Amino acid sequence: MEPGKLTPIRRSNAAALVPRERILIAAARLFRERGYRATTVRDIGREVGIQSGSLFHHFASKEQMLVEMLREAAISLCAGAQARIASSSDPVERLRVLIRFEMECFVGSQTRDYFAVLVSEWRDVPAAIQPELQWHRTRYSEITRDVMEDCLAIGKLRLPPDAAERVLHGITNGAVSWFKSHGRYSVSEFSDIVASLLLAEG
């Protein structure tokens, strides 16, 4: 399924009681903390301070909330990565930029919980959207692998590209559970540490 064929996100014309994105951000946080199945529409309404029934002015169901946050995470991950690495032709700098971008998505952005849910709630993704999300997962893997292979070609990668890719994604996915924005490391500092694990010296 190509990007041009993606189903557009439908925006409700109903009067907004609270911003739509605020509801999604709250829902994503609850999905990450409690799990999608354990979170109720009432929980989400309570989190944003409105009656659960009012949520249906914005979303047809809890499943639609899940679909929209996953779609946004998947699309922005691919599009953002491509845009960031296009700023440099140097393989090492491109990898550093990619690492920083991935860290920002998973632990530094306002929608970081979208990405956490993308990882943790895959089993609950509706069948209709799975091919779309899988296309983006594959595309992001290709982007990452290409950057890794370019670094290897100039002798700057410590690991085989497939192993380096898994290390990177494993670190960023794991950071979701422990990284604190006001903790010991900033996103930039921790990104540099990850880069030092993957890039050869000299």
List the model feature ranges, each with a label.
Residues 36-37, 157, 185:
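Conserved hydrophobic residue
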Residues 107-128, 145, 177:
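Amphipathic alpha-helical segments used for helix-helix packing
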Residues 19-27, 44, 69-77, 81, ...:
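Generic hydrophobic, amphipathic alpha-helix propensity
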Residues 75-78, 117, 127-154, 162-166, ...:
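Amphipathic alpha-helical packing segments from all-alpha helical-bundle domains
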Residues 1-7, 97, 101-105, 141-150, ...:
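C-terminal peripheral helix-coil segments that are non-catalytic and often amphipathic
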Residues 22, 26, 30-64, 68:
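Helix-turn-helix
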Residues 1-18, 29:
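N-terminal intrinsically disordered/low-complexity leader segments
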Residues 68, 82-110, 165-168:
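Hydrophobic alpha-helical connector segments
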